[in-house]
Amino acid sequence: MSRKIRKIEKHFKVFCEGDTEYHYIDEMKRQRKFAISLKPVNMKGGGYSNFLEHLSTDGNTNCLAKFIIIDGDRAINVEGEKDNLRELLEFCNSQNKSGRIPHIVVVNYPDFEYVACLHIPKYKGQNVTQYIINELHYRNLDEFKTDKGVYTVLNTRGNSTEIMLDALHKENCFVIHECKIKKNEYEMKVNMIWNWEKLGRRGSNINEFFDVITSF
């Protein structure tokens, strides 16, 4: 009797800075069907150097690409973090140039909570903390950050990921990636560009994450 050939499952790894991002991605992968599975990893803070340390030893088996989702405000508000961010970007860029597993860095500025507000059609740049409490009916920001159902909250009652994506502007992005995808061959080449003059502008390139995961 012939041996059954095991199908190799490719996946994307998604390294999330904290609980909010992790819960968002984890719930999204359960609700939406993607051709390539998502494997979120909760880094639980630790700054940019924590990402770099983890990525430098992380395995690549069956991994199609790695996404690194970080807040940009640390680079401005925490001493020494700008240099750590530079090292992280240079490491990811070297991985992309070498033809290894693509590393795509998503920088949310100032943070993911701002991106969360963009899911709400009425949001016009108000204070993020107060807006989340008032509009999404949380008692405080910590309750929002630890809510495992945050993806559902941000995609019901008129709120949606699509509204958030429409609100983003490429000219405000600190980092962007040019991705060339060969869908049938499960291959992707990435060119990464960042501009320090744009660090501090409200925005995000999280649209690139959605563009890639829906391209396969």
Map each language-model feature to its residues:
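Short beta->alpha junction loops
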Residues: 38-48
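C-terminal accessory helical subdomains adjacent to catalytic cores in phosphodiester-
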Residues: 2-9, 22-40, 54-67, 72-216
